[in-house]
Design a protein with these regions (language model features):
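Catalytic cores of nucleotide-sugar-dependent glycosyltransferases that transfer UDP/GDP/TDP-activated
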Residues: 2-192
Length: 192
């Protein structure tokens, strides 16, 4: 039986990404696949779902990630232990396809995850629900009328917007780190 693993910080169907993910899981099941959904347990607890649930992390991990974001503008780069634990679960599941919706949301370390995905050589589908994956900080650059992301982010006009950083602006470094991590998977295995 083929296996699908989807990743998103929220599971609840009151959010667009949670609903989309659950509906894709139901469609996969209806077509004979085994469906798994990985999400931030600390943010959503246990919710009804037809797919097998893979809760990731806990409240302490989310709090540490929140602090790394708010103080150092390093969103997506904390939760190291939770990410390594999740990778062990991915190995156990051994999915045929990994479908990423969002990986921001205080629950995964994208560098660790993408280093693993690049080595696994499995197809990765990434549905782009917002702009965070290709900017140095923000989710929606249009709110600030900013087009720095086209060349290189830095001095982010939305530093204090979600995911807010109150001390540092590391949008230049974040842009570099994301580009390196997100392009580490062979193009033939990455579908965006």
């Amino acid at each position: 039986m083929k296996k699908l693993l989807q990743i998103n910080p929220v599971l609840r169907v009151s959010t667009s990404t949670g609903r989309i993910m659950q509906e894709i899981g139901e469609l996969a099941i209806a077509n004979g696949w085994k469906s798994y959904i990985a999400y931030s347990y600390a943010r959503d607890g246990i919710k009804p779902c037809k797919s097998e649930l893979v809760p990731v992390g806990g409240k302490i991990g989310v709090l540490g990630h929140w602090l790394a974001t708010r103080l150092f503008d390093r969103h997506g780069l904390a939760s190291e232990r939770d990410t390594k634990d999740f990778i062990r679960v991915i190995d156990e599941i051994d999915p045929d396809i990994i479908h990423i919706h969002n990986i921001h949301g205080y629950f995964l370390n994208y560098k660790i995850l993408f280093d693993y995905l690049a080595r696994r050589n499995k197809p990765v589908v990434w549905t782009v629900h917002d702009c965070w994956l290709y900017t140095g900080h923000c989710y929606y650059y249009t709110f600030a009328g900013c087009s720095k992301w086209k060349i290189h982010c830095g001095r982010c006009p939305q530093k204090k917007k979600f995911p807010a950083s109150y001390l540092f602006d590391r949008s230049f470094k974040n842009f570099e780190d994301k580009r390196k991590a997100f392009t580490s998977i062979q193009a033939s295995n990455m579908f965006v």
